[in-house]
A protein has these predicted regions:
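Conserved SAM-binding loop of SAM-dependent methyltransferases across substrates and taxa
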Residues: 114-132
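Extended basic-aromatic, gly/pro-enriched interface segments that bind polyanionic ligands
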Residues: 110, 131-212, 216-225, 250-252
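Core SAM-dependent methyltransferase catalytic element
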Residues: 252-272
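Conserved AdoMet
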Residues: 2-108
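Conserved class I S-adenosyl-L-methionine
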Residues: 101-120, 139-141
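Conserved beta-strand signature within the Rossmann-like core of class I S-adenosyl-L-methionine
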Residues: 239-247
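A short glycine-rich, Lys/Arg-flanked "PGG" loop and its adjoining helix->strand segment in the class I
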Residues: 226-239
Length: 272
């Protein structure tokens, strides 16, 4: 598919899926390669024929929606953000939880892909923070709608490249190496509860102290759907809870109900 055909097709098909073209501009070739493979599977001649297929068969839109999912994941991705979480955000949340006499600090990793993000939190807590907060459980819920990615997350076996941003001493403590594959230690695997859910529909139960929703809703979703997600996130976060989004993302309609923490990082505190 030529680039101009790719652009034209995505600009046509993304809005009915509740997605926005601007979020896909940089990753369009990846998505269009998937669409091309699907077109060939169906024995269709070109993009126009696949477009006609979508018009004739509403069920094909579900398959197309899956082809438009983008997941780029590694441990400790955006190191400055994780450093802020470990050095400031999580200790403060843990202290507040202790003052409330809570027994658990709850975190949700939305769109967790193959598990690197929630496992990074688990490693950070157990290695650097847990000893300072005895008696406080760190509960991590991680959700994604891709069963293949979730299976990889539960297996917790990663190539060396996935760990390149993780502090070296943490890596040695958290993983067992088998050649070029790194196995996360069982206790850390058990510390994350994975579930198959689409953020556009079903969500985990309960309220959270920390939510990471990075490079997902506020990149790829249409503006009206972004507003719905943000409202629901606000309802699920405790007052004073923390929302982390992607480094190139912005909250829709400004930061209403949230206050951005300093240093220019995409870390927000719920203020109302």
């Amino acid at each position: 598919m030529r680039d101009e055909d790719c652009v034209r097709f995505l600009q046509w098909c993304l809005p009915p899926l509740g997605l926005r073209w601007a979020g896909y501009r940089r990753v369009r070739r990846t998505v269009c390669k998937r669409i091309e493979r699907r077109r060939r599977e169906l024995g269709l001649a070109d993009a126009a024929a696949y477009r006609a297929c979508l018009i004739a068969d509403p069920g094909e839109w579900t398959r197309l929606d899956a082809l438009c999912r983008i997941s780029i994941s590694r441990f400790y991705r955006d190191r400055a953000v994780f450093d802020r979480l470990v050095c400031d955000v999580l200790p403060n949340l843990a202290t507040k939880a202790g003052r409330r006499a809570d027994t658990a600090l709850r975190c949700w990793s939305a769109g967790c892909a193959s598990g690197e993000e929630p496992y990074s939190l688990a490693i950070a807590w157990r290695y650097a923070l847990r000893a300072d907060h005895p008696g406080l459980r760190f509960e991590i819920v991680a959700s994604d709608d891709d069963p293949v990615l979730l299976a990889r997350a539960r297996a917790a076996r990663y190539p060396a490249g996935s760990l390149k941003d993780l502090p070296r001493d943490w890596r040695a403590w958290a993983f067992e190496r088998d050649g070029n594959v790194f196995h996360l230690r069982p206790a850390l695997r058990r510390s994350v509860a994975f579930c198959r859910q689409d953020i556009r529909g079903e969500w985990p139960e309960g309220r959270f102290d920390l939510v990471l929703c990075r490079n997902l809703a506020f990149t790829y979703f249409a503006a009206d759907r972004q507003r719905v997600v943000l409202q629901r996130l606000s309802e699920r976060l405790r007052r004073g809870g923390i929302l982390v989004i992607g480094g190139h993302e912005m909250l829709p309609d400004g930061d209403a109900g949230f206050r951005r923490l300093g240093s220019g990082l995409p870390v927000y505190r719920k203020s109302s």
